[in-house]
Swiss-Prot record:
One of its GO terms (molecular function) is argininosuccinate lyase activity. One of its GO terms (biological process) is L-arginine biosynthetic process. Its EC number is 4.3.2.1. Pathway: Amino-acid biosynthesis; L-arginine biosynthesis; L-arginine from L-ornithine and carbamoyl phosphate: step 3/3. This is Argininosuccinate lyase. It is found in: Cytoplasm. InterPro entries: Arg_succ_lyase_C, Argininosuccinate_lyase, Fumarase/histidase_N, Fumarate_lyase_CS, Fumarate_lyase_fam, Fumarate_lyase_N, L-Aspartase-like. It comes from Carboxydothermus hydrogenoformans (strain ATCC BAA-161 / DSM 6008 / Z-2901). It holds the Pfam family Lyase_1.
């Protein structure tokens, strides 16, 4: 049943109909669409545009349709194009001409903007909860590894010692920014576009503020043209999702590396690993690899909508139909990735011995030797050179700095004393880094307190 055909003399070409239809993906908005229609007719009755009896009849039928869809009893039709017209068609079949009044004072342009705003608010709230669960997992793990020493890396080369707790909390703060971005995105999505009509509102005495309050919005869109043509709230949502996936991907990359025999820092639980169809010994980190791989599709979704929007004149254009599949796919991908990653992290085993052994190799205490010389009055650049030459000497003879004799150290600088051996022990090197935000256990305890506070 076509609800817009009055000015057309010819039927829509079948291929055009299928090409034009969006019901195969926008059916997911059925709940938001029905919520919006119930609020809309409630307002129409309050304004005297329809009767209370008509309102009750429409709301009763819409409620039935909602339950039928949830029960899987509705077959959506491409003939009705999209979720809006499918539901309206079902409504008219149930209650006849009264159902034709549901769209009074409304366009699909403001209707779809409403539906997607409600959807973004709902899914954004769910994603915020999933990010928070991941953050809580990171805090719990960090509390158990305050004294687990491991190498910190730059350029994937061992650099300076940190604790596993400090490393985990680095991701906590990344995800905290992600959570904040979603909150911020939802603030701007929290405006009702209903009443904007196709682009220029309507002559009917609608009460936009009343509908906005019924639907739980914080206000109404200020400009009718902007209300129907704005997709910033989707773009911001996609950007927040892409950034979150990027952080998940970075952590996943580390887990893939740490899980290898070359590192042996972690063992992934069997529930989050898979085997090889040919090599019986394999235990592959597929959960982490898939999250790393799926990040690209979320980036692609963001770029698709940015590119789609870049050349559109005001107001609504059919191009905007192409915003939904990237949005839906991003929601599914991000929620799935967060659930799987959190589950993997809750069950992962850290090899503290391997981490500690790695921290003892690779001259992670070299910076401390340079700073030891600085404290004795040596200019930093000179101290840097002296330490570099000592590293080279040790490296050529297969030793660490602590394995050089005091005489060998003094050859490079007579200022080096016996106390250097105690100062360069990895535990002492770490303990001295107690500045705010540093990796010393003392500093990390304070960081944990702040992390708990951030989640409160």
């Amino acid at each position: 049943m076509k609800l817009w055909g009055g000015r057309f003399e010819k039927d829509t070409d079948r291929e055009m109909r299928d090409f034009h239809a969006s019901i195969h993906f926008d059916w997911r908005l059925y709940e938001e669409d029905i919520r919006g229609s119930i609020a809309h007719v409630t307002m129409l009755a309050r304004q005297g545009i329809i009767t209370n009896e008509e309102k009750e009849k429409i709301i009763g039928a819409l409620t039935e349709i909602l339950e039928e869809i949830k029960a899987g009893k509705v077959d959506f039709s491409p003939e009705a194009e999209d979720i809006h017209l499918n539901i309206e068609t079902l409504l008219i079949k149930k209650i006849g001409d009264v159902g034709k009044k549901v769209h009074t004072g409304r366009s699909r342009n403001d209707q779809v903007a409403l539906d997607t705003r409600l959807y973004v608010k709902k899914e954004g709230t769910a994603i915020i909860a999933l990010i928070k669960e991941l953050q809580e997992t990171l805090i719990n793990l960090a509390e158990g590894h305050l004294n687990t020493i491991m190498p910190g890396y730059t350029h994937l080369q061992r650099a300076q010692p940190v604790t596993l707790a400090h490393h985990l909390l680095a991701y906590f703060w990344m995800f905290d920014r992600d959570r904040s971005r979603f909150y911020d995105c939802l603030k701007r999505a929290d405006r009702s576009p209903l009443g904007a009509g196709a682009l220029a509102g309507t002559t009917l005495p609608l009460d936009r503020e009343f509908v906005s309050e019924l639907l739980g919005f914080n206000g109404v869109c200020e400009n009718s043209l902007d209300a129907v043509s704005d997709r910033d709230y989707i773009l911001e949502f996609l950007f927040a999702a892409a950034t979150t996936m990027m952080h998940l991907s970075r952590f996943s990359e580390e887990i893939v590396l740490w899980n290898s025999k070359e590192f042996s820092f972690v063992e992934i639980d069997d529930r989050y690993a898979t085997g090889s169809s040919m090599m019986p010994q394999k235990k592959n980190p597929d959960a982490a690899e898939l999250i790393r791989g799926k990040t690209g599709r979320v980036y692609g979704n963001l770029m698709a909508v940015l590119t789609m929007m870049k050349g559109l004149p005001l107001a609504y254009n059919k191009d905007m139909q192409e915003d939904k599949e990237p949005l839906f796919d991003t929601v599914d991908t991000l929620k799935g990735s967060l659930r799987v990653f959190t589950g993997m992290l809750k069950t992962i085993k850290f090899n503290q011995g391997a981490m500690y052994k790695a921290a003892l190799k690779g001259f992670l205490n070299a910076t401390d030797l340079a700073e030891y010389l600085v404290e004795k009055g040596v200019p930093f650049r000179e101290a840097h050179r002296i330490t570099g030459e000592l590293v080279l000497k040790a490296e050529k003879t297969g030793r660490e700095l602590l394995e050089l004799s005091l005489d060998e150290l003094k050859e490079m600088s007579p200022l080096i004393e016996e106390d250097i051996y105690e100062k360069l022990k990895i535990e002492n090197v770490l303990a001295k880094r107690k500045l705010f935000g540093g990796p010393a256990p003392q500093a990390v305890i304070e960081q944990l307190r702040q992390a708990r506070e951030a989640l409160a």
